[in-house]
Regions:
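Conserved beta-strand hairpin/beta-sheet module of binuclear metal-dependent hydrolase folds
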Residues: 57-76
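Soluble or luminal CAZymes and related metallo-dependent hydrolases
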Residues: 87-95
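Core dinuclear metal-dependent hydrolase active-site scaffold
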Residues: 32-63
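Active-site HxH/HxHxD metal-binding segment of metal-dependent hydrolases
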Residues: 1-37, 66, 77, 133
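Structural motif
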Residues: 41, 66-68, 109
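Active-site metal-binding loops of divalent metal-dependent hydrolases
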Residues: 50-52, 72-74, 81, 113-116
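Short, solvent-exposed loop/turn segments at secondary-structure boundaries
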Residues: 81-86, 122-123
Length: 181
């Protein structure tokens, strides 16, 4: 995808409609462990490929003691992995395990970009377990259709105590099946 476009939940939008018209040279790459001190709030970036190859998660550490993990689309109660620009389930599982190792015990609330904006604690562990179940062929595989694309929902959406879910493509479970490079 060209840098002048970005994916907006199934539609490609001209980036200039959403970002300032600064020259690209003035932007800096966001990298793993990049940290920003905003005066009382420190934000640290972590890579979490899955929903997209460039998905990032942010640890927000406020001086009052609140610590948040902002997962956005990278990991939430209904994570999309079925699109062509998503990684395989196996790669997503690796990303989640690496992220968990880096941030475990460093946050007390999970924020995302959908629904109420708040996730239950234990989300990363639940998504890792769902990845394992997908790889083992032990999921509900409920058909899912959105915006001309289709995938399979791993767990029955009405399942009790469900903490996270994944929509995946059955032909992109293993690393070797990833389309993006």
């Amino acid at each position: 995808m060209p840098l002048t476009d970005f994916e907006g939940h199934g539609t490609y939008d001209p980036a200039e409609d959403y970002f300032p018209a600064s020259p690209w040279e003035s932007f800096h790459d966001l990298t793993e462990n990049a940290s920003f001190d905003l005066g009382g709030v420190v934000i640290t970036a972590y890579s979490c490929p899955g929903h997209t190859k460039g998905s990032m998660v942010f640890l927000i550490d406020e001086e009052d003691g609140d610590k948040y993990l902002l997962t956005g689309d990278a990991a939430n109660s209904f994570t999309f992995l079925y699109q062509n620009y998503s990684t395989s389930v196996e790669e997503f599982e690796d990303s989640l395990k690496a992220l968990k190792e880096k941030v475990d015990g460093k946050y007390n609330k999970i924020l995302n970009s959908h629904g109420t904006g708040v996730e239950k604690m234990g989300l990363l562990e639940s998504l890792i377990k769902i990845c394992e179940e997908i790889k083992a062929g032990k999921t509900a595989e409920v058909p899912f259709f959105y915006n001309g694309s289709s995938g399979l929902i791993a767990c029955q959406p009405e399942s009790e105590n469900l903490n996270g879910n994944i929509v995946f493509h059955p032909e992109r479970i293993w690393k070797k099946d990833t389309i993006i490079s």
